C-alpha cells in the first residue's frame, strides 16, 4: 500500500517537472520599451518548449537546446531600475533653450549699449554748454554798446593819437612853418607888432584841409593863444590911444576859395 502511494507521488512530480521550463528574464527591446520576464512554456507554446531562446533584445521559448540563450550575457533585472537601464543617459535639451539664450544675449547688448550712450551724452553735454555760453557775455556787451559811446571813444582815441605839446611849453612859432604845410592863410599888415616874425610874413594854422566856409567867430581859433589878446578887444587896452585910430580888422571869407584871408589897417601910435 505504501509503495503505491510513493509511485503516485513520483508520477505527479514528474508531470510537474515536465510542464515547467526555464524562466526568461525581462529585457528592453530596440525601441526602448521594457518587456517583463515570463516562464516557459507560455500559453500558446507547445509543452516541449521549455528553453529560453532568442537574443537580449528579443526573447521567446523554444524546444531545441541549440537555440538556447545564455541569459548571463544580457543585463540582469538587478541592473535595471523600474524597467529602465541603470546606465545614465545624457539629459535631453529642450527645444526652446537655444532661442531663449540668443534672445537674452540680444536684449543684454541693447540695454548695455543704451546705458553707454546715456553716459557719453551726460559727459559731453557740460563741455558743449560751456563752449556755447562762453562768448555770450562778450556778444551781449558788444550789442548793448550805443553808437554815441563808439563815436566818443573813436574821437577820444583819435585825439589821443595826435601829438600834444608839453605843459608849459610855448606854442610853435608860426613864422617858421613852410608854405607846403599850410591851408589857411592870414594876410597880416607889415606894421602889425609880432614877436619873432619879420615884416610881410604870412601866418598859417597847421592842420588838415579846412572847411570851405568859416564863420567869423571861429577866426581866433587859428591864432596862437599869446597873440589872440592882441586881436581881441580888451577893456584894459585902448586901441585908439595906441594906434591913433580904431583898428578895423575883419575877415574876408570868399565862398569860392578854401582860403580865409584876414586883413586890417592899424597904425602905430
Curated annotation (Swiss-Prot):
Keyword Membrane recorded: yes
Main localization of the protein described in the UniProt heading: endoplasmic reticulum
Compositionally biased region (Low complexity): 146-162
Segments in the Extracellular topological domain: 19-98
Any one Gene Ontology cellular component term annotated for this protein: membrane
Sorted UniProt keywords: Developmental protein, Endoplasmic reticulum, Membrane, Signal, Transmembrane, Transmembrane helix
Signal peptide boundaries: 1-18
Transmembrane segments: 99-119
Cytoplasmic topological domain: 120-269
Membrane topology: Single-pass membrane protein
Location in or out of the cell: Endoplasmic reticulum; Membrane
Entry superkingdom: Eukaryota
InterPro entries the UniProt entry points to: Shisa (IPR026910), Shisa_N (IPR053891)
Cited function: Required for head formation during gastrulation. Functions as an inhibitor for the caudalizing signals wnt and fgf, does not inhibit bmp, activin and nodal signaling in head formation process. Induces retention of fzd8 in the endoplasmic reticulum and inhibits trafficking of fzd8 to the cell surface.
Note: 'Shisa' was named after a sculpture form, common to southern Japan, with a large head similar to the Egyptian sphinx.
Family per record: Belongs to the shisa family.
PANTHER family (alphabetical): PROTEIN SHISA-2 HOMOLOG PRECURSOR, SHISA
Subunit architecture: Interacts with immature forms of fzd8 and fgfr.
Protein's UniProt name: Protein shisa-1
Organism classification: Eukaryota, Metazoa, Chordata, Craniata, Vertebrata
Amino acid at each position: 500500500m505504501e509503495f503505491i502511494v510513493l509511485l503516485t507521488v513520483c508520477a505527479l512530480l514528474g508531470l510537474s517537472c515536465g510542464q515547467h521550463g526555464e524562466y526568461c528574464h525581462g529585457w528592453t527591446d530596440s525601441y526602448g520599451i521594457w518587456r517583463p520576464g515570463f516562464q516557459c512554456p507560455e500559453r500558446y507554446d507547445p509543452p516541449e518548449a521549455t528553453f529560453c531562446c532568442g537574443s537580449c533584445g528579443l526573447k521567446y521559448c523554444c524546444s531545441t537546446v541549440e537555440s538556447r540563450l545564455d541569459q548571463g550575457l544580457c543585463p540582469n533585472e538587478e541592473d535595471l531600475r523600474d524597467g529602465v537601464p541603470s546606465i545614465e543617459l545624457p539629459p535631453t535639451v529642450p527645444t526652446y533653450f537655444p532661442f531663449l539664450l540668443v534672445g537674452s544675449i540680444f536684449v543684454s547688448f541693447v540695454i548695455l549699449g543704451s546705458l553707454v550712450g546715456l553716459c557719453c551724452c551726460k559727459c559731453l553735454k557740460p563741455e558743449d554748454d560751456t563752449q556755447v555760453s562762453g562768448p555770450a557775455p562778450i556778444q551781449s556787451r558788444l550789442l548793448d554798446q550805443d553808437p554815441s559811446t563808439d563815436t566818443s571813444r573813436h574821437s577820444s582815441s583819435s585825439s589821443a593819437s595826435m601829438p600834444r605839446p608839453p605843459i608849459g611849453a610855448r606854442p610853435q612859432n608860426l613864422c617858421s612853418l613852410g608854405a607846403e604845410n599850410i591851408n589857411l592863410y592870414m594876410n597880416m599888415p607889415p606894421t602889425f607888432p609880432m614877436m619873432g616874425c619879420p615884416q610881410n610874413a604870412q601866418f598859417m594854422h597847421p592842420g588838415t584841409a579846412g572847411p570851405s566856409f568859416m564863420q567869423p567867430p571861429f577866426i581866433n581859433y587859428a591864432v596862437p593863444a599869446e597873440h589872440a589878446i592882441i586881436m581881441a578887444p580888451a577893456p584894459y587896452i585902448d586901441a585908439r590911444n595906441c594906434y591913433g585910430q580904431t583898428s578895423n580888422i575883419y575877415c574876408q571869407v570868399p565862398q569860392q576859395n578854401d582860403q580865409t584871408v584876414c586883413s586890417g589897417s592899424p597904425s602905430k601910435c
